[in-house]
Amino acid sequence: MKHSIIIPTLNEEEKIFQLLDFLEANALPDTEIIVVDGGSKDKTIDLAKRFKNVNLIETKRASRAFQLNEGARQAKGEILYFVHADVLPPQSFEEDIKKAISSGNDFGCYRFVFDKRALMLKFNAWWTRFDFMFCRGGDQTLFVTKDVFNKLNGFDENFVIMEDFDFILRARKQFKFRIVPKDVVVSARKYKLNSYFKVNMVNLYSYWCFMFGKSPEKIRDNYKTWLTFD
């Protein structure tokens, strides 16, 4: 089954080259690599254009759910693999995903570790091996058959944040989920710019707001107000 890797970007010049270089080196020859940019003002687009095997889709809408859906709409693969720009999958990701799907799973993710080896970050990462909803999220990457993705109508574009949680929550009600017992490597940049305690508290608050049906716009606004980003 052909795989399509879909990467949403917005001002990711610090990370996108590393990810695309890794994917070109480790993906199968027929695997499709799609970058969906939401209107970057930095060098993200120029960097993506350096890779001849990358299909770059430029949009002016900076909405991750929309970008992911647009990538999926144009993807030719039977399996979709959604990867954030600041994440590196294991070198074995192609085989891992193939095995997970062939074993009867419809969608899944990885565990993660951070690229900074602080003790408290190791504690956070440790939880991602467990099948708790709070432990999920797009940082762990997400693979899903295109058939299942289409049956769920993709990501809900009303979710301007936490679209990954919404998708997984809906998918788990109907389809079989698998956590691959290997780690992707996630950037700890958010923790470098903010305190460990602050990021965890904002994440916890955002999760409970999501679970209790609070407005995605309100969750996003609070998230951006309370945390510092690049």
What label would you give each PLM region?
Residues 11-25:
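Short, well-formed alpha-helical segments that are part of the catalytic scaffolds
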Residues 14-18, 42-50:
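Acidic helix N-cap motif at the loop->helix transition within catalytic regions
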Residues 20, 30-39, 57:
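Short beta-strand/loop segment that forms part of the nucleotide-sugar
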Residues 59-75:
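Glycine-rich, basic loop-to-helix element that forms the pyrophosphate-binding segment
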Residues 80:
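Short aromatic/hydrophobic "clamp" motif used to bind/position activated sugar donors
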Residues 91-119:
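Conserved donor NDP-sugar-binding/catalytic core segment of glycosyltransferases
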Residues 172-230:
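Hydrophobic helical membrane-anchoring modules
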